[in-house]
């Protein structure tokens, strides 16, 4: 109440500065209120934060660094002119009280009672930290001139060893001294990079629009340029070359249909794969791999038997067993087929003529029909009188 009224600059009518001194004296209150209830004993209640990890002696629980307590602060002594304060607080997990006090000589806190410290200290010299001067050493420096002179020489050696680090720190600090110049350089760099980014984005959008891509493009790198220079995206044969090759294939093709369609199909697929090279070898391989090449049916008339079952017979003559097909090249396929057809027709004519002379006159018409049909490479089954089977 006194604080609020004092802040609001309100003073009662009977307030006398000489008598009361302040508004708190008028209301007989302290500005710290409940925290100053033991001020007459020299104790002030403060918020104390645990400086390191400890274990409570009462409940044996761990209390972490940074936990805050309402502690009683009291002055218990001096280290030279520096006061030593003691803090007394109650554990929040049990009824045990913990007492700690400051140690100005080591710049640390010391546990007086009620807890044990978790040892996590390290050597300050190994960590290259600033070492505090011991009390005995301070006394020697103040009383012993020779010791002070020797200590001054050691200090100069330390300074000489630390000069490079100090110069580096000063140079680094001087580089950030002019804030306006640094800000101008940063904004200038940002404007330049912004223009470059805008140009790259415009180029990427043009490429995406031209190619119809909807995915973002990654930035171009030197490795990508080298890899792209090594690749070639072009057809091995131009349109004119393909057209000329097609015309050569058509001009070299046979005018007559080949009787062996199966063998011709296999040979044609090989010719398309191999092209103009090895054409003769491919045809020879296709002909040798086929088991039924150029079958020829020949219809003959029997001399002795006149029965319907033994009226005719069929003979299959492969091309590769014919005498005309020997000692020839596979590339002369059309001429081979023509020679074989001529020789076969001659044999058929002679055979059918002898059969016609030996048969009876009642079968002359059939023999004439057989002679007429024998000249063809395909058997004629249109004769209804003959019941021959092929």
UniProtKB/Swiss-Prot annotation:
- Which species is this record about? Danio rerio
Annotated region (Disordered), positions in chain: 354-390
Cited function: May be involved in mRNA splicing.
Q: What is its main location?
A: nucleus
Q: What is this protein called?
A: Probable splicing factor YJU2B
Q: Which UniProt keywords apply?
A: Nucleus
User: Where is the protein localized?
Assistant: Nucleus
Q: Which GO terms describe its biological process?
A: mRNA splicing, via spliceosome; RNA splicing
Look up the record and report any one GO term of the cellular component aspect.
post-mRNA release spliceosomal complex
Q: What family, per the record?
A: Belongs to the CWC16 family.
PANTHER family the record matches: SPLICING FACTOR YJU2, SPLICING FACTOR YJU2B-RELATED
Coiled-coil features, chain-numbered ranges: none
Disulfide bridge partners, by residue number: none
């Amino acid at each position: 109440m006194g604080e609020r009224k004092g802040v609001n600059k309100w003073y009662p009518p009977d307030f006398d500065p000489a008598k009361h001194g302040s508004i708190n004296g008028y209301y007989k209150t302290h500005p710290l209120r409940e925290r100053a209830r033991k001020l007459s004993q020299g104790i002030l209640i403060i918020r104390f934060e645990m400086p390191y990890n400890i274990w409570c002696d009462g409940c044996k629980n761990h209390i972490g660094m940074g936990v805050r307590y309402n502690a009683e602060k009291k002055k218990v002594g001096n280290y030279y002119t520096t006061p030593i304060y003691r803090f007394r607080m109650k554990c929040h997990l049990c009824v045990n009280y913990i007492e700690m006090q400051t140690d100005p000589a080591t710049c640390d806190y010391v546990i007086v009672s009620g807890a044990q410290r978790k040892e996590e200290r390290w050597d300050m010299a190994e960590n290259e930290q600033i070492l505090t001067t011991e009390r005995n050493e301070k006394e020697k420096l103040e009383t012993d001139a020779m010791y002070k002179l020797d200590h001054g020489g050691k200090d100069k050696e330390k300074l000489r060893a630390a000069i490079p680090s100090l110069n580096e720190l000063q140079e680094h600090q001087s580089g950030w001294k002019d804030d306006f110049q640094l800000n101008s350089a940063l904004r200038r760099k940002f404007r330049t990079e912004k223009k470059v980014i805008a140009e790259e984005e415009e180029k990427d959008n043009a490429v995406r629009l031209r190619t119809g891509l909807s995915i973002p493009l990654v930035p171009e790198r030197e490795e990508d340029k080298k890899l792209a220079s090594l690749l070639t995206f072009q057809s091995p044969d131009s349109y004119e070359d393909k057209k000329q090759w097609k015309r050569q294939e058509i001009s070299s093709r046979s005018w007559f249909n080949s009787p062996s369609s199966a063998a011709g199909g296999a040979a044609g697929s090989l010719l398309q794969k191999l092209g103009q090279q090895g054409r003769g070898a491919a045809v020879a391989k296709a002909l040798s791999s086929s088991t039924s090449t150029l079958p020829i049916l020949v219809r003959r008339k029997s001399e002795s038997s006149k029965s319907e079952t033994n009226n005719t017979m069929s003979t299959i003559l492969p091309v590769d067993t014919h005498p005309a097909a020997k000692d020839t090249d596979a590339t002369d396929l059309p001429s081979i087929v023509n020679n074989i057809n001529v020789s076969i027709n001659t044999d058929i004519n002679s055979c059918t003529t002898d059969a016609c002379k030996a048969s009876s006159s009642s079968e002359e018409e059939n023999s004439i029909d057989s002679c007429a049909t024998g000249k063809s490479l395909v058997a004629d089954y249109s004769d209804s009188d003959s019941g021959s089977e092929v």
